[in-house]
Amino acid sequence: MELFSAEAENIRKKVEEWITHPDYELETTFGATGEVDAVTFLAVAQRLRAKGYASLPQEDRLTVITPEHVRFTLGSLGVIQAYCNDDTMAGKPYTVMIKDRATADSQIDLEDYETRIKVRRERDMAHDDATVKKIFTTWPQQRKAFRIIRRWAFDADGVRIDMSIVRSTQKLRSGEFKWQRSFKDQDVMLNQPTYEIEVELLHRADDTPEIAMKRLIRGVGEVLRGIQKNTVLIRKDTRKKVLAAYRELTKTDLFRGPALRTLRKENFVKERIPKTPNIRDGYNVTDKADGLRCMGFVDSKGDLYLIDMGMNVYRTGLRNPALRKSLVDGEWVTKTNDTPPKPIQQFLVFDILQATDGRDVSRFPFEAGATMPVEEGAAPPAVPPPEDSRHFQLKAWVSTWNKDDGPKIMVNGLTPATKLQVAAKEFFFGKAGNDSIFRMASRVLTAARPYYTDGLIFTPNAMPLPEKPAATFWEQLKWKPAHDNTVDFLVITEKKTGSKSQDKVIAGIKPGPGGETVNYKTLRLYVGSNDDNARDIILNRRELPRRDRTAYGSRGKKEYKPVIFTPKEFPDPMAAICRLPIQSDPDTGEEYIMTADSEEPIQDKTIVEMAYDPAQPPGWRWKPLRVRMDKTERLQRGTLSRTLNSEGVAEDTWNS
């Protein structure tokens, strides 16, 4: 975690104050408003567990806050329920304290990390304290805010990391509570949960400001690495500069790499279908790694950054000026195919768009010497030199990157063993007019690799990349085995009648052997479309389209929107339904539905990767494999493109 000298000095002073005042609490919060989204919350929890930190679930608690910062806390579910019913503290075990700022300048905002370090003063109060007794005399009239907190604590060597799911009294735009007098004035349990992460510095007898500060920065850095999903942290200001440089190089704000289509039967049959790509007509094949698709962008200094499809920027801490202002396409792999997986850091390059100093090579054919077919009777095209191919340029780029001792390490703590390893994918080339591509595909499938692969990518040897950013490369095709052939759906949980927030829970018998009785929730599955979906309009009673009421924008461009999944070929009336049994956490009693492979809780309105098993009963055929954190994050920022699969992609996968 890089800090400016002024920031470091301010933190040191706050730590020094904290050491000299035992009643002070020094804590760090994350997010612009002290909150993070559910996806980030889960990502941090996963990182902490992967690093070996044990989570200690705590009892649910209800905190009642007054405008004067007096906090009453009730523990245990039974006591909380009793208060919610009678709105009185009488006869209930509670603790009370006053918590406020220690000094007028008691907080430091690290805006580049959306992090706030603050010193608060806590003072426990007795039940017979005059202030407490005075509050109780007018308790029904007192303005209050309620926070129901479910918390997990991680002990991290001298700091405690608290992760909390909170349902609270609503807030005004100013951030102040919308105060209430009775718990029943607002049904707090129906409010959407918020997610909070705090790092609290713990007192030690031998603390010095320097030692305690290192401990704090280490704990804060650990959380930030979970938030940024990367070991090497990046400041917000640096991210803005990188995206500006990327825009200057590519002339777009979009992800420059193309989208590809799913391989279908007509793409490999012996009898050609007019205007249909066929992998027998001069294609190469490589493996499809199970990683994060990223552009590898090298800025004018030679610093390498990875940029994912959501335009999130990841710093590598590596520099090679010989490759300045270049752009490659690849997959960032972070785990091996061992059981359980082990962490690795590999960026596997499979294409190149711009070589050093921004030289555009995207219009080159992929294979050296490959040429596009010409009409019968026309003169054969000139064969380009080997260097006028993307495969040649790709290999040259990777060779230059790893030349001699490799790139220069620019970040303290990064070592040759822990730095990002950059390598080129291995390609096997088929010849046009025969079945050699199938032998090449077999070689790819049987080759041993340290990372998990979930399919094959077929690329035409002679074609250039699409000129437009984020365009579909219609001739580039992906194939996945049946168990990995998946669709990324937007999932929306079916709600109780009359409610917009409460999920509908059904008790029923799951069809099949055994007739198991289960409580389950139902997910509705959505894909993206530019067209009006007739089934969606009829079943959901939407307005019918007409000339003055269509899905077109003011400029006549169709709106890309979620529609219920309705396959046209091989129809299944339950294709857009996914029923999942409810699981219960033995530690907290929390109930949720979860993915099968990664065992992650599934939140409403997230992107979930699902596989289809026709052998299961109707409604139970979709198997959720994992929550697509990267795509869900983009969706929550308001970006719909490249999140849920499009109607066409989902249909291709369904038909394949």
Predicted regions and their residues:
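Phosphate-end processing signature that detects enzymes handling 5′-triphosphorylated RNA
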Residues: M1-D253
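Residues that form ligand- and interface-recognition hot spots within folded domains
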Residues: G158, I165-R167, L201-A205, G310, ...
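Beta-strand-rich binding-surface signature
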Residues: E25, I149-A153, G158-R160, T194-E198, ...
